[in-house]
Amino acid sequence: IVDEPIDQWLESISFDSTAEVPIPDTLVDQVIGQEDASLVIRKAAEQRRHMLMIGDPGTGKSMLAKAMTELMPSESLEDTMCYMNDDDENEPRIRTVPAGRGDRIVKDRREQLREQRERTSRTLMFVALLIGAALLIATIQSGEIITLLFGLFILAFGYMFIKNRLVSNDESRIPKLLVKRKRGDMPPFIDATGTLAGSLLGDVRHDPFQSGGMETPAHERVEAGAIHKAHGGVLFIDEINLLRLEEQQALLTAMQERAFPISGRSERSSGALTKTEAVPCDFILVAAGNLDAVQHMHPALRSRIRGYGYEVYVNSNMRDTARNRRRLIRFIA
């Protein structure tokens, strides 16, 4: 413990401004006053264990959680894609590919459809010209101009209808990229504090046009949740007691299965009929809160974290030592 007043102690420190103070490269080393929690963070990142941090607001819990992403390997990151299901349109298929390939697959598929659409348009145009020529010859022989006009109207309508149907059917074959990653990216850090069920667990958007050829395919309306976006990374939830018990139970299921299907969360929405295959969500959960908040957690969820992870009580104050005073200077810098 340092008894010397801060003003006198600062006179013994040789620097002109905080720009001269060296800053650690890693985020975990920039956290001050939480040495024990920093050690646990390193272990949890290495062992891929869940964590529950208990402490007052403003004690560095979210910063410690974000620091885990720098300590985790990024070799296994994946893109998650959603495909149309020919057998059941309300159960879209889910596939994963290495990070960076999903965007390329979608672009390649769009290019293939563009080329196919051009070939189809040329074929339809050739057929339309043949039919138009036949109508013209028939009109010349019969001398009835109304027959030609009526035939051309039917021909134009049929051409546009067939072309639009083919284009819409082709577009529905393009997969949707639910979770996009890039090669070399750090593992994701997703802060899901205060999110609703749809944002946390995923949702299916409502389709106002559900028939008549104007409907949107189910796989295009699927939206990934925070648990899916955190696949391969860290999911941070502060004040976890604010989640309803049903949402905490679903979160526990996702942690256990490492995959969770996406379904419509609103009973009055057309998306309620849609439920995808299980979507990968292998994440590290870092939950946080104060003592009162933790007491209102789902018992099974807390038991899972304590049994297969770490429960840490973060410090609310730090000792007045010379080392900690230097760390405060670094924090200001």
Describe the residue ranges of each PLM region.
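FAD cofactor-binding and catalytic pocket of flavoenzymes
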Residues: R327
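Conserved ASCE/P-loop NTPase catalytic core
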Residues: I1-A322, F331-A333
